């Protein structure tokens, strides 16, 4: 969930974007979802104002002709975020991971799968992408233009299992919420 600051804002960076997390009556402004009596650990914050700085719509970042992704066990994926807050400056760190459980099945009746990765604090809420080295068409209007890499948004990372444990030999498994949960949360609130 977004972190509340003293002035009820979420701050992405001192120089970037400041979003209110609560309205004047102290009601949360983000969207979340409960399933099977448990919270899905994804928050969607609606952005109602035009923002011109550093924003790239995830759909614009994907190759439009490669939408069908079959995510499999052992596929290499990346968790893109800011470990410990701001390491890396304005650009995120790409932490390599691999799919560690069957991604087409829910775990504990919840829509997530495990990733094998050694992530650290600050990565929760990060997008998870499949990033494969293979040529793909960039856009129909750019016929004959190819990218060397295929990138596809495949989930939202929400932390390691056993992260609060003193055991330094924990399994280093992270929970990745399935990408369709983002659409489900938005659809529920935008009806």
Model-derived segments and spans:
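C-terminal tail/extension regions appended to the core domain(s) of diverse proteins
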Residues: 159-191
């Amino acid at each position: 969930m977004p972190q509340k600051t003293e002035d009820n804002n979420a701050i992405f960076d001192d120089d970037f974007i400041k979003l209110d997390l609560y309205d004047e009556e102290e009601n949360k402004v983000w969207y979340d979802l409960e399933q099977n009596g448990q919270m899905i650990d994804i928050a969607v914050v609606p952005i109602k104002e035009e923002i011109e700085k550093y924003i790239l719509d995830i759909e614009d970042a994907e190759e439009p002709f490669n939408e069908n992704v079959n995510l499999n066990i052992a596929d290499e994926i990346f968790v893109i975020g800011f470990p410990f807050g701001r390491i890396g400056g304005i650009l995120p760190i790409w932490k390599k991971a691999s799919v560690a459980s069957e991604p087409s099945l829910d775990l504990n009746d919840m829509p997530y799968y495990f990733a094998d990765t050694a992530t650290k604090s600050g990565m929760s809420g990060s997008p998870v992408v499949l990033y494969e080295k293979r040529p793909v068409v960039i856009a129909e209007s750019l016929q004959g233009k190819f990218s060397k890499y295929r990138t596809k948004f495949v989930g939202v990372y929400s932390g390691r299992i056993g992260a609060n444990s003193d055991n330094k030999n924990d399994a280093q498994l992270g929970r990745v919420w399935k990408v369709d949960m983002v659409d489900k949360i938005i659809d529920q609130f935008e009806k």
